[in-house]
Amino acid sequence: MDDQPVVAAVDGSPDGLRALEWALDAARRYGATLRVLHVRPEPPRTRQEPQGAGPPGADEDPVLAQARARVDELGGIPSVEYVVTEGVPGALLPETGTAARLLVLGSRGRGGFASLLLGSNSLAAARDAACPVVVVPRPDRGGGEEEPVHRDGPVAVGTSAESPDTATLEFAFTEASLRRAGLRVVTAYPWPLQTMLLPGEVAPAQVDQEAMEHETRALAEGLLAPWRERHPQVPVEVVVLPGDAAGHLVGESRDASLVVVGRHRRRLFAPARMMGSVTQAVLLHAHSPVAVVPPARAEQ
């Protein structure tokens, strides 16, 4: 069995139960322990309350009791742990990533404004955790009727043809392999090209869009060669499109079982951990679960 657990963060909300179900499936795929975690917001202490008083144990926690009932109902997982702790969820949840294979959360919990598409705890975990974080959206995220969940759909991954994120690609290929699903590798190129000219400069020759697409595809096919060699059983389709990468990935999410995106590498004078605009947009608007993968240590 895998030494690193798949962690499901629950809080008693329907979003948390959806995350629990997704995490249970993931634990089965990886042959890993499922750790069900409830981070209780720390209540204010009263004068009469003993200083050493802590949260109820896992056996007494009502949120974990609800989760345990759901796990027992679904079954099929050999090893499950239930953990309760107290503190600030937005700070404690990312810390669990140091010893986890995967951290899974719902897009919204019980706190905050119901109209928000992504909760602050989910955003903090996706931005700061050391392991991949999967955010499971609400089925009615589109604002209308509940959308079907494509559990058997392909895995979609966004990557740059010029500077690929190795950790993101490895995660996507592994997920596709374990699911026995196809992998759609989405890469976008800038179009139309924006050219800024200073006074006296001559405009460059017109760039042909077909040539730009051909060059981008050739780069993408080249960078994927090592992963195709390691995962020959995964059918791969390279999707090269102009313009908005986030919009294309959100479009892919309608039929995908999972969309995989990378978190930004560390940059000079920037926060140690950050997310780019594409990753944030996909988290906010995707119809399928989204995996946010931190960069490999060598790339940070």
Model-derived regions, located:
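Short beta-strand elements of ligand-binding domains
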Residues: 106-107, 133-139, 290-294
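Actinobacteria-biased recognition of intrinsically disordered, low-complexity terminal regions
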Residues: 1-5, 51, 142-151, 198-203, ...
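Glycine-rich, Arg-bearing micro-motifs that act as flexible, cationic patches
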Residues: 105-124, 128, 152, 258-284
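Protein-protein interaction modules outside structured cores
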Residues: 214, 237-251, 255-300
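A short acidic, glycine-rich active-site loop
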Residues: 53-62, 205-216
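General small-molecule cofactor/ligand-binding pocket signal
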Residues: 35-37, 81-85, 134, 184-186, ...
